[in-house]
Amino acid sequence: MAAKDVRFGNDARVKMLEGVNILADAVKVTLGPKGRNVVLDKSFGAPTITKDGVSVAREIELEDKFQNMGAQMVKEVASQANDAAGDGTTTATVLAQAIVNEGLKAVAAGMNPMDLKRGIDKAVIAAVEELKALSVPCADTKAIAQVGTISANSDSSVGNIIAEAMEKVGRDGVITVEEGQALQDELDVVEGMQFDRGYLSPYFINNQESGSVELDNPFILLVDKKISNIRELLPVLEGVAKASRPLLIVAEDVEGEALATLVVNNMRGIVKVAAVKAPGFGDRRKAMLQDIAILTGGVVISEEIGLELEKATLEDLGQAKRVSITKENSTIIDGAGDQAAIQGRVAQIRQQIEEATSDYDKEKLQERVAKLAGGVAVIKVGAATEVEMKEKKDRVEDALHATRAAVEEGVVAGGGVALIRAASKLSSLVGDNEEQNVGIRVALRAMEAPLRQIVKNAGDEESVVANNVRAGEGNYGYNAATGVYDDMIEMGILDPTKVTRSALQFAASVAGLMITTEAMITELPKKDAPAMPDMGMGGMGGMM
């Protein structure tokens, strides 16, 4: 086991604080509408330019191991805020730095760290309740666009495209961000349920221009097994032919004689038909077939529940207004399922999301909710260069997370104003002893730090602005982009309540741990063994 370097008390805390300040000072320059850029060197390719706090934090690794421990703990604050709300990473870092600096001053003055931490925790719990009381719902498109704009460093085009995407696919829809090919941002919306399985034979194509299969008002047969014998399909085919409507078959696979017969029937115009494989694998395939059944008002023909394909009738088939199938994807538009059943299924999947432990499972379940509830929108980010593309994509993703958080828990006045209003309501809060009171004051003072940093980055006098905002009431605050004092919500400067709340909670949690640190242990660097001396070629002298 390698030897360790151990430091205690103030010696340990000073080193840790140095690391905290190095990381936080690099991150906090990005805060606010006039936040600066940070350039990140990459081992290959062009450097990355970013205003995203968590991207800056993730790049920082310090040579001094004790300083690095402090930096890594603040990095954890940014990462947790990012995971919980998708934004607010810089705010969380600024809050953590302020609490740690103020808290460690009190510890150095002889205060009991445990009581300080209890005081900080009391203040934060009360502040979170105040933030919830200040919160207003964020339902309309204008408010969503404003939240997106603020999160994307005052880029209104980003806010507007996110609001448009949310309007089209609903609050439950999936919105993804991709790198586009054009200079402008583009929005692609897929209505209905789309899954990544294309037609099983190109002979099903009936739209030669687009190379796709278009079925209007089709029946949809859902089968949880492979179909290779055409005799199993005959009763359904005869019923569909009599109804003079097209048929989509979604099965584990359709092969051999069954596929050949379907192709021949389609080409002769006897039955307009297309077949695709069911999406997913294993249990996920069964679940997705059931989703399609509920969306279209049909039944999954499965021998597990005693249903046989030969005995299927038209009542067992789903229906939709239109189905479009390409080589890679199938889209079912306007399924005929019962809305109450669809909402019940969505609620059931949401419960599974709550219980899921892996991010992959959560993502897949969220996709299923979107396909049932709304649709899928893809924002294609446009930029002139690759460097700009990466920077803009980061901002769009942040803004998207922020708008989701705003829809979820509402919004508060932005620009650090909500934290100042929450702190002013807690001026009468007292702890169990004087040291807890100091902890409460540490937290309340730290809650001014985001506003001060926004003002500082804008090149204005932070103390003057902080005093003016503190003297105001309600949503009165300072617009750092224009230098104007007014109602922040009316000016469109909003922060999602969830983002502000998460930033404060995570910052206080990690800062509390750092304040109560009494010893730090790290491995001593290994000393390289001395190189072997050059032996030469002794005893060979005199040779010509």
UniProtKB/Swiss-Prot annotation:
UniProt binding sites for ATP: 30-33, 51, 87-91, 415, 479-481, 495
Top class in the EC scheme: isomerase
Highest rank taxon of the organism: Bacteria
One Pfam family linked to the record: Cpn60_TCP1
Keywords associated with the record: ATP-binding, Chaperone, Cytoplasm, Isomerase, Nucleotide-binding
Record keyword Flavoprotein present: no
EC number: 5.6.1.7
One GO term (biological process): protein refolding
Principal location: cytoplasm
Catalytic reaction list: ATP + H2O + a folded polypeptide = ADP + phosphate + an unfolded polypeptide
Entry's Gene Ontology cellular component terms: cytoplasm
GO molecular function terms attached to this record: ATP binding; ATP-dependent protein folding chaperone; isomerase activity; unfolded protein binding
InterPro entries assigned to the protein according to its UniProt record, in alphabetical order: Chaperonin_Cpn60_CS (IPR018370), Cpn60/GroEL (IPR001844), Cpn60/GroEL/TCP-1 (IPR002423), GroEL-like_apical_dom_sf (IPR027409), GROEL-like_equatorial_sf (IPR027413), TCP-1-like_intermed_sf (IPR027410)
CDD domains, sorted: GroEL
Location in or out of the cell: Cytoplasm
Assembly description: Forms a cylinder of 14 subunits composed of two heptameric rings stacked back-to-back. Interacts with the co-chaperonin GroES.
Function statement: Together with its co-chaperonin GroES, plays an essential role in assisting protein folding. The GroEL-GroES system forms a nano-cage that allows encapsulation of the non-native substrate proteins and provides a physical environment optimized to promote and accelerate protein folding.
Family to which the UniProt record says this protein belongs: Belongs to the chaperonin (HSP60) family.
Name of the protein: Chaperonin GroEL 2
